[in-house]
Amino acid sequence: KMGITAKGAWESVKRHFREMGINTQTTDFTVVGIGDMSGDVFGNGMLLSQHIRLVAAFDHRHIFLDPNPDPAVSFAERKRIFELPRSSWEDYNAKLISAGGGVFPRGAKSIPLTAEVKAALGIDPAIEALTPIELMRAIIKAPVDLFYNGGIGTYVKASYQSHAEVGDRATDALRVNGSELRCKVVAEGGNLGCTQLGRVEYALHGG
C-alpha cells in the first residue's frame, strides 16, 4: 500500500525536476538513496517512476551497487522485493544487477571497486577499494540526478558546522557537507536528513 510520506516527497521531486525541464515520469534519471525496499518511504518512493535508474543505495545492513541499471528490469525487481515480507537488499536477484555491481554487507572490512562503480559514483579511478563507511559517503556525494534519503539520521551539514552541533552521533562517520553534494536534487523522505544550514549550503552550491 502506498505511503503518504513517500507520495508527498515524490511530488516535490517531480516539481524540482520539472523546473529543470525533466519529466521524471517519462525520462530516465539516476538515483542514489538511503533505505531499502522494505522501508515505507524508500520502498514506496522507488516505485513512483518506472524511469528510476537506482545506481546505489545503502541501509543499516547492506550496500547495493547497480552502476548501469535497466530501468524496466530494476523497477520490476524492486517491486518484487517490496512485496516480500521483511526483505533486504540481499533478496535482490544478483543476475539482474548490471556488470560491476553487487550487494555487500556493511560489516565488510573493505569493498573492491569496479570501473563501472567508480564511473557511476564519480570515484577516482586510481582507488581500488573503500571501507563501507567511505563507500557510503561516496554514494551520498555521487554526481547523480537525485539523492533520495529514506533513512534515519542527519547525513548532510554545512561545512562550518561541527558534528556535535548536529546532535546525531550515530551518523557522524557518514555525514558530508552540503558543498560536497553533487546531485541535482535532494529528496528528504526521512526525518531531518539535512541540517537547515546544510540545505542552504547545498542550494548555494547549485543544488
Please give the residue ranges for each predicted region.
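Non-transmembrane, aqueous-exposed alpha-helical and coiled segments at domain scale
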Residues: K1-G207
